[in-house]
Amino acid sequence: MAPPKAEKKPASKAPAEKKPAAKKTASATDSKKRTKTRKETYSSYIYKVLKQTHPDTGISQKAMSIMNSFVNDIFERIASEASKLAAYNKKSTISAREIQTAVRLILPGELAKHAVSEGTRAVTKYSSASN
């Protein structure tokens, strides 16, 4: 047990000399831990859409949480259905067609029509911007 104690003392002395560097790495690891625990949400996008439609209306944290859960749920349903459609057609890639069909299957009537038209418009805008 004496040799490990002797080894620990010189090791603790060496980092003591490099404390400023150790603090930087410690703060870097702390910030990395914070980024790992950070939860990604659609809050900023929901807020932007709210301000486009109702500029003088706000939203509470609870309502924002509900909206975020709603968006996550719809996203999960569409992705799951699109995945099934790709599997049925023996394809390993989900394309815009699978997403469009999944939206038509999941959303009811007029809502599906509007979603498909808005999605098509967004894809067209993205394609023209990237060229």
UniProtKB/Swiss-Prot annotation:
InterPro entries found in the cross-reference section: Histone-fold, Histone_H2A/H2B/H3, Histone_H2B, HISTONE_H2B_site
Glycyl lysine isopeptide (Lys-Gly) (interchain with G-Cter in ubiquitin) cross-link, renumbered residues: K125
Keywords: Acetylation, Chromosome, DNA-binding, Isopeptide bond, Nucleosome core, Nucleus, Phosphoprotein, Ubl conjugation
Assembly mode: The nucleosome is a histone octamer containing two molecules each of H2A, H2B, H3 and H4 assembled in one H3-H4 heterotetramer and two H2A-H2B heterodimers. The octamer wraps approximately 147 bp of DNA.
Modified residues (N6-acetyllysine): K8, K9, K13, K18
Keyword Phosphoprotein recorded: yes
Cross-linked sites for Glycyl lysine isopeptide (Lys-Gly) (interchain with G-Cter in SUMO): K8, K9, K18, K19
Residue numbers bearing the Phosphoserine modification: S12
Protein name (record): Histone H2B.1
GO MF: DNA binding; protein heterodimerization activity; structural constituent of chromatin
Signal sequence segment: none
SMART domains: H2B (SM00427)
Subcellular localization(s) per the UniProt record: Nucleus; Chromosome
Species annotation: Scheffersomyces stipitis (strain ATCC 58785 / CBS 6054 / NBRC 10063 / NRRL Y-11545) (Yeast)
Coiled-coil residue windows: none
Posttranslational mods: Monoubiquitinated to form H2BK123ub1. H2BK123ub1 gives a specific tag for epigenetic transcriptional activation and is also prerequisite for H3K4me and H3K79me formation. H2BK123ub1 also modulates the formation of double-strand breaks during meiosis and is a prerequisite for DNA-damage checkpoint activation.
Gene Ontology CC terms: nucleosome; nucleus
A Pfam family per the record: Histone
